[in-house]
C-alpha cells in the first residue's frame, strides 16, 4: 500500500467513485453550515426543480453576514436587500426542516465559530460551505472548503459534490514563537513568502513543533487564513489538545462511542514517508509581529519594517501591485509601518473573534485608553463568546478603554450592515482580508 498524506486519506475515505482520469471524484460531504448571503439562490433552485434536502440534519443555517451588531439585533436589517435575504433564509429553514440559528438565538454567531462551539466539526470529517474560510475546520483534522451557490444546491439535494483532488503542500513550522507573536504572524509570514496565489490548487498540511505548541484556537486562525494564499484546504493532524477541546460539545459522541471515536481519530495523520508535491519551511526564531499594509494579505511586513519601494521589485506585475496599493492606501514608500495613522480599530471575525483573541486584546488594553481620533469596535465571534467575555470581565476592560462592545456577527469584515468605513478611513483590523472595499 502506498503512503498517503492526511488530505489524501480524507478524500479517499469520502470518495463514492472516480469520475475521470483527471482527478475528479464524487465526494460525500458530512456537514455543511450555510449563511444568509450565499445560499438563497440554492434554495430557489431546489424549489424550481421540485427537489428536497436529502439530509436536513447534516445542515445548519446561521445568520451572521448581514445582521446588525449594535444592541438592538432583532430590528430590521439596515439594508433592504439584507432584510430580504434574512426573511428568505428563515422561510427556507422552515420549509426544508433545517435548524436555524437566528439573530436572537443564544447559539448564534459567525458560522466558523458556531460550528466548533456546537460540536458540529469532528476529526476526519469533510465539510463544505458557502464561505471560503471553511478551511478553518482543518484545525480539527477535518477537511473544509468553500463552495459556490450552484454547488450548495447540488449538495442540499444529493449530499455529494463533484470534487477535483488537489495537490499537497507541507508547511513545516519549527522553533518557539517569540514574545507577542501568534498564529496570525505565522500565516502572514507564509503569505509574504509564497504570495496570495502560492498555494492555489493545493491543500496545505501544517506540521512542526510550533504548530503542536499552538492552541486549538490558534490553529483555527492558521487554517482560516490559508485560503488567502489560494489554498482550497488546510489541515493539521488532530492531537490530545483537539480531543480535549471538543470533548463535551453538544453534538459530540459520549460514553463508549466517544472512546471508539478517539481510537479512530488518533489514527488521522500523514504517513511518515508520504510524499508532498511542495514543501515550505518556516523557522519562528526570527519571526516578529507582522502587519499587512496594502490591498492584499501578502503585502505584509514586520511591524518594525517599512513600506516597500515599488522600483526595487523586479517582477513587473508585483511592482504594479505595489504601486496600486500605495495609491489606494495613501502611503509613501519607505515610511515606517508603525507610523501609519489609523482612524479605526476592529477586533473580531472568524479569524480572531474567539475568547482567546479577546483575552489577548484585554491584556493589551487594560489600564489604557484608545487614541481620541480612533474609533474602536470589538465584535465577539459568537453570542457564547460574548457571554463568556462578559463573565470574565473582559467587556468592562474594552469599554473602559473606549471601545464599542458589540453583538456577534461578521460586522466590518464583510461590511454588509452599518459597520462600514467611509472613504479615506484606515482601519487596523484583526480580520483575514484587506482587499479594496473590505
What are these regions (language model features)?
Residues 1-438:
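Fe-S-dependent hydro-lyases/dehydratases of central metabolism
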Amino acid at each position: 500500500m502506498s503512503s498517503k498524506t492526511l488530505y489524501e486519506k480524507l478524500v479517499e475515505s469520502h470518495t463514492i467513485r472516480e469520475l475521470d482520469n483527471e482527478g475528479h471524484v464524487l465526494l460525500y460531504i458530512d456537514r455543511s453550515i450555510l449563511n444568509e448571503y450565499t445560499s438563497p439562490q440554492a434554495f430557489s433552485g431546489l424549489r424550481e426543480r421540485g427537489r428536497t434536502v436529502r439530509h436536513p440534519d447534516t445542515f445548519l443555517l446561521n445568520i451572521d453576514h448581514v445582521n446588525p451588531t449594535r444592541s438592538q439585533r432583532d430590528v430590521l436589517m439596515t439594508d433592504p436587500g439584507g432584510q430580504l435575504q434574512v426573511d428568505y433564509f428563515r422561510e427556507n429553514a422552515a420549509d426544508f426542516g433545517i435548524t436555524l440559528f437566528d439573530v436572537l438565538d443564544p447559539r448564534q454567531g459567525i458560522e466558523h465559530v458556531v460550528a466548533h462551539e456546537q460540536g458540529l466539526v469532528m476529526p476526519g470529517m469533510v465539510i463544505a460551505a458557502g464561505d471560503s474560510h471553511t478551511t478553518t475546520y482543518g484545525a480539527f483534522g477535518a477537511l473544509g472548503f468553500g463552495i459556490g451557490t450552484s454547488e450548495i444546491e447540488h449538495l442540499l439535494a444529493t449530499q455529494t459534490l463533484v470534487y477535483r483532488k488537489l495537490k499537497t503542500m507541507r508547511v513545516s513550522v519549527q522553533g518557539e514563537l517569540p514574545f507577542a507573536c501568534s498564529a496570525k504572524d505565522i500565516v502572514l509570514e507564509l503569505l509574504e513568502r509564497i504570495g496570495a496565489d502560492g498555494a492555489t490548487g493545493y491543500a496545505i498540511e501544517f506540521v512542526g513543533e510550533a504548530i503542536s505548541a499552538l492552541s486549538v484556537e490558534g490553529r483555527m486562525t492558521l487554517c482560516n487564513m490559508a485560503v488567502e494564499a489560494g489554498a482550497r484546504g488546510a489541515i493539521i493532524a488532530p492531537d490530545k489538545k483537539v480531543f480535549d477541546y471538543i470533548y463535551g460539545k453538544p453534538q459530540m459522541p459520549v460514553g463508549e462511542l466517544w472512546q471508539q471515536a478517539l481510537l479512530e481519530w488518533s489514527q488521522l495523520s500523514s504517513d511518515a514517508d508520504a510524499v508532498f508535491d511542495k514543501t515550505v519551511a518556516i523557522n519562528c526564531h526570527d519571526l516578529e509581529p507582522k502587519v499587512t499594509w496594502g490591498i492584499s494579505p501578502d503585502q505584509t511586513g514586520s511591524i518594525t519594517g517599512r513600506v516597500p519601494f515599488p522600483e526595487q521589485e523586479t517582477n513587473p506585475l508585483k511592482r504594479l501591485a505595489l504601486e496600486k496599493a500605495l495609491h489606494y492606501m495613501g502611503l509613501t514608500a519607505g515610511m515606517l509601518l508603525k507610523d501609519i495613522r489609523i482612524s479605526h480599530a476592529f477586533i473580531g471575525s472568524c479569524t480572531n473573534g474567539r475568547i482567546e483573541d479577546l483575552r489577548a486584546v484585554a491584556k493589551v488594553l487594560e489600564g489604557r485608553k484608545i487614541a481620541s481620533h480612533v474609533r474602536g469596535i470589538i465584535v465577539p465571534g459568537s453570542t457564547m463568546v460574548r457571554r463568556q467575555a462578559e463573565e470574565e470581565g473582559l467587556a468592562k476592560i474594552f469599554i473602559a478603554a473606549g471601545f464599542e462592545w458589540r453583538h456577534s456577527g461578521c460586522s466590518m469584515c464583510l461590511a454588509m450592515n452599518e459597520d462600514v468605513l467611509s472613504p479615506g478611513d484606515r482601519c487596523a483590523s484583526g480580520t483575514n482580508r484587506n482587499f479594496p472595499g473590505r
